[in-house]
């Protein structure tokens, strides 16, 4: 079979499932470079809480979108797609295969199907009006406004996520169309890539145990000191970076609003909830190939062999003679 253009390999799955080690082994086997689809690993100085891959673990494999932004920078889906597309160009120009690795399904979907989430020109007067309403009447009032015009968006966006609530109201105000309908239409696009979309998974109880072990290891490795250093650098709870799982809870402890034991308990609980939401997302996605670790007897070599067969069948890799 001839090789097809625009190859892309995706390796995702819930938090703590073991994506990192498998991604390195895969990259070395297929001459790949890795694009991180993680909303936290892109930030410098945020290593422990994001479970960031360290240079010595990379084993010579080039990683993009790791350690590229300051914690004060905003990182969102539009910026991710911009940066990831630039990385894709570099990787293919180097004759390598891009491997998108990470657990942020929304980012992966946007890149894979080239979904348009770019900001349109907005009516800043209307935005100011909404911001004033939020200040005077509260987030709940704004969220009720959204529920009246776009119930699906109101269902998907938490009322405390004021920025996204305002964006959805703005979109409706400017276009007369619900942003939920726009996003749904965009998500039905076909992909411009020849891709293989792998989701690594494990038994739920084992996954939850791994999450607990990982959180304990993070605390032992110095998570509290890491967050304290970030605080000294001027990082605060309103920054996108500091709203990440593990950071906001330790920040609450440092600010005296919880004990360390409570913070650790909440991180573990919220990490389990996050893993559950990730799996729900991946089950809804099209064309995914599940890699259930028990089916491969927890042997990464067997998983890799299966992945190689899939990549050859899809024309992403040449068939071995």
Would you name each region that the model predicts?
Residues 1-321:
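Phosphate/pyrophosphate-binding catalytic cores of soluble transferases and nucleic-acid-acting enzymes
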